[in-house]
Amino acid sequence: MKGISIRELELPDAVIGKLLKLAVEDKRVISLGPGEPDFLTPKPLRDYTKKIVDQGTHYGAPQGNSELREAICTKLRKDNKIKSTPENILVTCGSQEAIYVSLLASLDVSCQVIVPDPGYLVYRPAVELVDAVPVPLELREDEGWIINTDRLRRLIDKKKTHGIIINTPSNPLGTVLDKKILEEIADIAVEYDLYLFSDEAYEKLVYDKKHVSPGSLNGMEDYVVSFYTFSKSYAMCGYRLGYVVGPEKLVQAMTKVSHYITLSAPTISQLVGVKALSLSQKYTEIMRKEYDRRRKFIVQRLNEIGLPTMMPHGAFYTFSRISHLRKNSYAFAQELLRKSKVAVVPGTEFGRFGEGYIRCSYATELSKIKIAMDRLETFVKKKI
């Protein structure tokens, strides 16, 4: 039997999957690991799904349902202040496919892409899968986990760098980049003629701040490629529906690539997506307010316990320092799971600069978070 490809063997193992598998198998475990809403998909969308299933299913157009792309244009103009046409939009199987096909369509072998570190665990492997080179941009707690543009500029190789990936609001950090820093990053992208890949999966889950889309900035139409998903805003994770908006030439190339990978996003999901974009924002706001309540509680408890944690302003994660207790974040998470039955994600899942930290998700009901914090406190007291 032939072996496994070198490409696959060089991919990092997803530690998060192993830990969460153990959490599912042991009913005593409280998991603060999930990266998905704990809410049901809104009832109007569930009811509509049942209705359209009876109409049958067929393959869809590779670029996506035209009615959905029109609805996305309206949403982008209203919510994100991004001007677009249906030709600038590709509907995908979640934002992860959007990220992957954008890299496939824009990068050649050995091109470099700057990725945030700590950053969403998909970025580095996605870049490597297209035989390009991820260049980690260190984010620091003492800088508020905000991108340092001087450090960013120093990483750029005029011949090799082709793009920068940013994520606002951030997974795992919860940071929300303001307009000023986005304008500085945008100026760098224009100066060096780079794509600015903007992952905005958590755009609707912002607290105390305002979400700004880089694609709304003046003069960025030919540079910004923005990724969105229905998973977080509408609790539609299982529908696998997302979309990307960017320069028309690149989007057409992405459509060609996507055609040979998935053919099209699920047609049922796309029809539900049209319905979702017509819904009242009250459904998203109910989730956002509940996450906000949990956010304030868990951050206060983590700091009381002795795990320094900055207040996140978006998404539904905290990123806490544990280096004063144990240098190895994976060992800390593994021991916490084994001894205290609490599952968290080690910071190294998000890059080497995540060492010494753990990520907790507050996409878990508050009563469980309270129990998990009590268990964590007992665990930490034994470590001190």
Predicted segment positions?
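Active-site phosphate-binding strand-loop segment of PLP-dependent enzymes
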Residues: 135, 139-208
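Conserved PLP-anchoring active-site segment centered on the Schiff-base-forming lysine
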Residues: 105-127
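Conserved core segment of the aminotransferase class I/II
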Residues: 222-292, 296, 300-302, 378-380
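Conserved glycine-rich beta-strand-loop-beta hairpin in the small C-terminal domain of fold type I
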Residues: 274, 290-299, 309-322, 354
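Helix C-cap/helix->beta junction micro-motif
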Residues: 26, 130, 159, 191-192, ...
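PLP-dependent enzyme catalytic core of the Aspartate aminotransferase-like
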Residues: 154, 326-328, 335-344, 350-384
